[in-house]
C-alpha cells in the first residue's frame, strides 16, 4: 500500500490508536470511571506496569509502521475520550502518581510515547498528535454534550493552547486538530449541515502559539 502511494510522490502516515476506556476490552482505564451510559459500570484503573506496556505497544506499532514504509506516525490519541485523552483530562484522570495531577503529569504518557518512537525510529521520523481542542461536554456519559460549549467539564481551548505548547517542547512534529468527544458526537462526527471547516476558528487560535504545523479535521470536505 505504501509503495502505491509513494509511486505518486506522496507521503503516508500511519495512525496508531488505543481506545481503552471507550470499549469493553478488559474494562480498564486511566482511573476508575464509568465508561458507558450506565454509571454503575466502573472501569478498573491501570497500574503503572500496565501503563508502561501500553506505551511500549504504541512504540512497537510505530516501529512496524516504519518497516512497512510509512513516512511518519499520527498518535491517535488525545481526543474523543480515548486513552491519552483520559490521561490528559482532569475529569477522567484522578491518579495521584506521576501520571496524574498537574497538566505535565497528565501528558507524561504522550511524552513517553514520543520519546520511545523517536529513540526507535530516529529523531527525524515525523510524529504528530491528534488532539481535540474543546470537548463540548458537561460531564461523562451519554447525553452530556453541550452544543453551546457552556459549563465545559472536559478540555477548554485555553488548556489546549497550553497543551500544544508543551507538545511542541516535547518534540512533536505537528498537531491534528478537531473538537468534540463521545459525549458530544455532534461535534466529533459533525453532520452535513454543520458549516464546513467549523474547527478552523479553534485551530487558528492554537497556531498563534506554536511553530509546528497545524492540521485540521472536521468538515474539511473541499480542498479548494
Locate predicted features.
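Flavin-dependent oxidoreductase catalytic cores
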Residues: 1-224
Amino acid at each position: 500500500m505504501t509503495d502505491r502511494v509513494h509511486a505518486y510522490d506522496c507521503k503516508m502516515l500511519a495512525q496508531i490508536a488505543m481506545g481503552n476506556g471507550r470499549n469493553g476490552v478488559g474494562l480498564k482505564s486511566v482511573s476508575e470511571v464509568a465508561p458507558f451510559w450506565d454509571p454503575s459500570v466502573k472501569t478498573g484503573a491501570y497500574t503503572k506496569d500496565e501503563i508502561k506496556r501500553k506505551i511500549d505497544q504504541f512504540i512497537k506499532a510505530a516501529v512496524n509502521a516504519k518497516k512497512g514504509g510509512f513516512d511518519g506516525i499520527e498518535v491517535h490519541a488525545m481526543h474523543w475520550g480515548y486513552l491519552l485523552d483520559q490521561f490528559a483530562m482532569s475529569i477522567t484522570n484522578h491518579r495521584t502518581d506521576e501520571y496524574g495531577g498537574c497538566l505535565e503529569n497528565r501528558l507524561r504518557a504522550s511524552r513517553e510515547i514520543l520519546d520511545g518512537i523517536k529513540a526507535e525510529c530516529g529523531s527525524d521520523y515525523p510524529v504528530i498528535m491528534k488532539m481535540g481542542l474543546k470537548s463540548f461536554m458537561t460531564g461523562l456519559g451519554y447525553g452530556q454534550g453541550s452544543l453551546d460549549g457552556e459549563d465545559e467539564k472536559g478540555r477548554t481551548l485555553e488548556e489546549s493552547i497550553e497543551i500544544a505548547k508543551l507538545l511542541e517542547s516535547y518534540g512533536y512534529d505537528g498537531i491534528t486538530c478537531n473538537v468534540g468527544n463521545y459525549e458530544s458526537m455532534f461535534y466529533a462526527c459533525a453532520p452535513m449541515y454543520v458549516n464546513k471547516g467549523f474547527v478552523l476558528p479553534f485551530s487558528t487560535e492554537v497556531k498563534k502559539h506554536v511553530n509546528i504545523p497545524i492540521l485540521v479535521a472536521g468538515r474539511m470536505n473541499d480542498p479548494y
